[in-house]
Amino acid sequence: MKKILLVIIGTMMLQSCLKDREEKITVAPFEGAIVEPNIGGSAEPNQVWFDLSTNTHTTNERPKWDLAFYSGKEFRVGINYSIMMAAGKIEGATDIDKVTSEMVSDLKEDVQVATFTPDNERYIDNPEGNYISGRTAIGEISATEKDNAIYLVNMGKEIYKGDIEKGSVSTGGDARGWMKVQITREGSAYKLKYAKLDDTTHKEVIIHKNPQYNFTFFSLKDNKEVNIQPEKKNWDLCFTVFTNLIPGAGSYIYSDFVLVNNLGNVGAYVISVPNGQNATEVYNKLSKKDIEENKLSYNDQRTIGGSWRDVFSKSVNAKNIYIIKDSDGLYYKLRFTRLTNIKEERGYPQFEYKTL
């Protein structure tokens, strides 16, 4: 009887050890879908944040936010890349209340997007999205208060409200004006000072970091924090208008752009199907064993960018297939199937994806 008990106990212990050693496998709650993100038409008024594992999204109008305060250990602040915002340091300024329009009249000419001058890239954030060590228009926020400059902020453009020719887009409407800002540290938080250019008093607000999110967003127009991105683990792709760079020509505004959530540990790479091969067949046959892990990019949010479409032919680039790995370690294959709707209007993209 004792021998039987020992065998039973030994078997139970072995099974327990094996269970402890089993690798936990994350199973996607959603296997894939055909998706039509709500960009909103030819003025592309919306940003859409999409989560592949659940086939869910959140949407906001592009001008709903102005500044993005980074939640990591670094103190970094981004500007709204979807509405042609720009920011430049006001040299010699030490008192935000004494800055006037007259003082910055020359700087206004420079702090612009799409001037086709190479050096204007200094007035936008590095489009790769590397907020930790990359360049931002507003410099890293120093622990020494006096080292934090006052910035002239071009507030960019409102959503265009007029008629748009079929097949075209209009990414910007009326100018949103100018502001002056200064940002310092307040313990583990940020202190934001801001005002209209000729105001002689300013507003102040404390912005706290929230580690569940990549950023805390703030609207200078509405004087409040705003909800924009989902929690950093709950989105993979962003569909948006975007301020990018043209080599040798500086900043420029791009429509139909797709960003990857690199800061939330989402990676991606593109497979370009060679001429002579059927892209649909290649897509259908792609499986997890075909993934090349070393090609996944985590340091450039533009891996998809505008490479999925051809604006001149108003069609998708059918040769491009995208491999995406989300923050839970799930893999997806994705391709775009439409740039316009049946009326040939822009701002109605479609894509399909499947879990690998």
Per-segment meaning from a language model:
Residues 1-4:
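Positively charged n-region of N-terminal signal peptides that target proteins for export
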Residues 18-356:
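Surface-exposed, beta-sheet-biased, low-hydrophobicity segments with strongly acidic/polar composition
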Residues 13-16:
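C-terminal motif of bacterial Sec signal peptides marking the signal peptidase cleavage site
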Residues 6-8:
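Sec-dependent N-terminal signal peptides
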